[in-house]
Amino acid sequence: MKKPIYYLPGHGGVLQKGLGAALLARGHEVMGRETVGEFNRLPFGQQVEVIAQDLTAHFTQSDAQVIANSFGAYLFMHAQAQMQPFAGRVLLLSPIVGEFGSDELQRKTHLNFIPPRADLLYELAKKGTYPIPQNAEFHVGSEDWQSNPENVLALAQMWGVQSHMVPGSGHAIDRGYITQLLDRWLT
C-alpha cells in the first residue's frame, strides 16, 4: 500500500466513498475524519483541534499529503491556522473559505451560509500571519455557489499558491477533471 493520505471530505462525507474510494482504488491508505457521526457532533473548535492533533501526530513529514474537499477544506485550513506550516502537499477542492451567499443568491435560492469563524482565514492572510502550507493548491468550479470562486482565488493569491478555476463546474467539480488532477498530483 502507498503512503497514507489524510482526507477530509465535505459535510456528511465518509472516507470510503466518493473521492476516498478513488484514492483507495489507486492503492492509497486513506486516513482522516469523516464529517458524520460522533466527529460531526463535536463543536467546531473541537473538530479543528482533533484534526490539528491528527496532523501533528502522523503527518509532519515533507512527503505527507492532505486532500480536503468543501467543508473538510475549511476544517483543514482552520487546523492549519493553529499549527506550523504544513510541510507536505495539500490539495483543496471546492474549499469553503468563509461566508458564502449574496443578496442575489438569497433572493433566488433562499440559501446563505456563514460557517464558524467565517472571517478568520482572510484576517490572518491579510495580516500575513497565516501559516501557509509549503505546497498547496486550490481548485474550484466557476459556477460554485458554495465556494465562491472569487473568494477562493483571492485567498490563494494572498497565500501565494496555485489556484485553478474549473470552467462550467459547480461545487461538485467534474469527475473527469478530478481524475486527471489525481493522475498528476499523486505521481
Residues of each region from the PLM?
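Active-site catalytic motif of lipid deacylating hydrolases and related acyltransferases
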Residues: 2-60
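Gly/Ala-rich beta-loop-alpha elbow adjacent to hydrolase catalytic centers
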Residues: 67-77
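Short beta-strand/loop motif that positions the catalytic acidic residue
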Residues: 132-133, 137-140, 144, 152
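Active-site nucleophile elbow and catalytic-triad environment of alpha/beta-hydrolase enzymes
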Residues: 110-129
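Short glycine-rich catalytic loops that host catalytic nucleophiles or stabilize transition states
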Residues: 33-37, 164-170
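Active-site nucleophile loop of the alpha/beta-hydrolase fold
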Residues: 35-38, 91-100
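Conserved alpha/beta-hydrolase "acid-adjacent" motif
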Residues: 16-17, 145-151, 174
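Catalytic histidine-centered segment of alpha/beta-hydrolase-like enzymes
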Residues: 41-43, 169-179
